[in-house]
Structure formats: C-alpha cells, structure tokens
Amino acid sequence: MKHIFIINPAAGKKDSRQRVYTMAEALKKNHNLDVECMLTKSRGHATALTRAIAETGDYVRFYACGGDGTVNEIANGIAGFPNAAMTCIPIGTGNDFLKNFGKDAEPLFLDAENLWNGDVTPLDLIDCNGKYCLTIACTGIDARIAESVHEFGASPMLSGRGSYLASVAVNFLFHKIGRRWRVTLDDEVIEDT
C-alpha cells in the first residue's frame, strides 16, 4: 500500500510542511513504507490528485494535511474507490471534522504513528449538488461564515478562533441573513426560507 501525504501549504496560521515531511520520513524509515508527499497548488487540486491516483486501482492511504477543506477535497477525490482510504493530520484553522472523534482526538491525529495502519471505516457521504460532504452540510449564514473565515485568517492579529469570530460578526452585522433554499432528501423535496 502506498501512503501519500497531501499537504495544503495554505492551511492554518503557520507553515506546517516541515512537520509533515518529518512525520512522513519517520513512517518510511521506521516501517519501510512506500511514502510520498505532494503539495496542493490551488482549490480543487487535492480532489484532482487523489482521484487520478485512486483511478489506478492501487491500494493507497491518503493523509489530508490541512483543514476541513483539504479533508473535503480528498473525500471527493476518493469517493467510490474501495482501494483508497483517507485519514487526516489537522493543520488547518478549524479542523471541525475531528470533533466527530471526540474532544481529545486531535493529538492522536497529529501523530502519524497512530494513523498508518489504523482500521478503515466507511463513511456515508452527503451529496450536495454533485459534491460530497462528510459529516455536515452547511447552508445560509453558517456557510457564509465558514467561507469568509479565510479572509480574516491572513491577519497575524487573529488566531483561528479569532478569525471565526470576526467572520461571525461581519456576516451578522453587514449581510442579509435569510435565503430561500431547496433540499431533496430520499426523493422528498423541501423548500423554505
């Protein structure tokens, strides 16, 4: 099995590439694994990379090194490929996906020794207009807050939480809150505002 670290260099408040390279090298050395590191270059690149690799049919474990966006992109790239598995190394701003594993999970995911031979558990995916979501699909104000948090993330004055709170404030104070939406769930259509 190949172990590929997909690193989003834009994730988080600090450059964590060296930390990931060190983890990958340790796995290669300590366990004689086939390990490779790849950097993403733009939005959607992780999806394209992982899909192309998964399409070869070779067994592969991807390490999503970034935040929730990187995790989401890799999930979209490997969806439908039983030869591909994913775990994550949380170096993003929010890392909300990890909250599904308990409040004390993050340190476990920051140590690749815990991840390289872990059990693979299938996840149901949420299909949202042809794009998959893992455990949550946000709409309206919540989605706008998540999208604009990155505008504040570049500020050296704000932490990850500070960026989130700034985004909440701006979206509640300066943007319209209500929007019309339509959801299809198990062939039932629901429309509302």
Residues of each region from the PLM?
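Catalytic core of DAGKc-family lipid kinases
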Residues: 40, 80-193
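Short glycine-/acidic-enriched loop or helix-start segments at secondary-structure transitions
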Residues: 16, 73-75, 98-100
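Glycine-rich beta-strand-to-loop/alpha-helix junction loops that act as flexible
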Residues: 9, 65-67, 89-91
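Short helix-capping segments at alpha-helix termini
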Residues: 28-32, 79-84
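Short Gly/Thr/Asp-enriched flexible loops that form oxyanion-binding sites at enzyme active sites
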Residues: 70-82
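ATP/NTP phosphate-donor binding region
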Residues: 1-62
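A glycine-rich beta-strand to alpha-helix segment
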Residues: 60-65, 69-70
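Short alpha-helical
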Residues: 44-45, 69, 140
